[in-house]
Amino acid sequence: VILRGGSEAINTNLSLSKLIQKSLITNSVDPHSVQIISDTSRDLVTELVTTDKYIDLIIPRGSKELLRFLKAHSKIPMIKHLDGNCHVFIDEFADLAKALKIAINSKTNRFGVCNAAETLIVSKGIACEFVPKVVNELSKKNVTVRGCDQTNKMVSNIETASEADWHEEYLGPILAIKIVSGIDEAIDHINHYGSHHTDAIVSESKKNQNIFTQAVDSSSVIINASTRFADGFEYGLGAEIGISTDKIHARGPVGLEGLTSLRWVVSGCLLYTSDAADDRCC
């Protein structure tokens, strides 16, 4: 394992690496099995990500700029932890008391995390009743609301959402609200603007729950629960290195199991394949 951090935390990283290596020695593991690179220059990263002869996998954690750089230069496969533009969809068949608690928790439990909700989507059938209530609760939490045109007609003193807002991972006390005609438009919005991270539906309709889970192309799809449950510990995976939005190998919260692969061992007693192409017996 090779660890390479940024210049802003190099002293902390060096101290942590000493603790890791001390722990490895205590447990009779080669201390060189975990190494840290003290050089924080970008040139070294460019060189490192082309050494596919020696490195099997890169797990980048950082800015969008870092991920774009690695995508352009790396010759090594990556498990990427990208944006968390997460949505909560309040279906027309939702229990609105549940919906209010789920929406508020998804947004305000912690702002600066990747599984916090950034857009609330509300079916027009219950919007007139639900939207004013949720905006009122959000205001108590000092959350700025940016709404679509229909939202602005229902409540006052909120900002108007722009096209950019639907793409945005705010990581702060801002929430966009979109009113849609129904579940189909909600799914289209999520698949178009979302980051395939975590998206939730609040609904008492089993039919709509199934439609949503089948059609929303995200690593975690949640029914009647907060988006904050998209987490390695909550899924029983233990500590995670990130939440992958890729579709190859590990997807969603990536723990130790997600970093492993299979190796097949065949044990026999004079087992051999037949020479005949149509004979599959050993």
Residue ranges and their predicted role:
Residues V1-F93, C128:
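Rossmann-like NAD(P) dinucleotide-binding subdomain of oxidoreductase/dehydrogenase enzymes
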Residues S28-V34, F111-A116, T144-Q150, T198-E204, ...:
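Flexible, glycine/charged-enriched surface loops at secondary-structure junctions
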Residues I58, S123, A186:
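Residue-level signal for inorganic ion chemistry
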Residues L66-G172, I223:
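ALDH superfamily catalytic-core signature
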Residues F89-E92, I121-K124, V180, V202-E204, ...:
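Short beta-strand-to-turn element immediately C-terminal to the catalytic PLP-Schiff-base lysine
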Residues L120-V122, G172-S181, H196-I201:
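Short, well-ordered beta-strand elements within core beta-sheets of diverse protein domains
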Residues I183, D188-L271:
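C-terminal core of ALDH-fold dehydrogenases
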Residues Y272-A277:
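Conserved small/polar residues in nucleotide/adenosyl-binding loops
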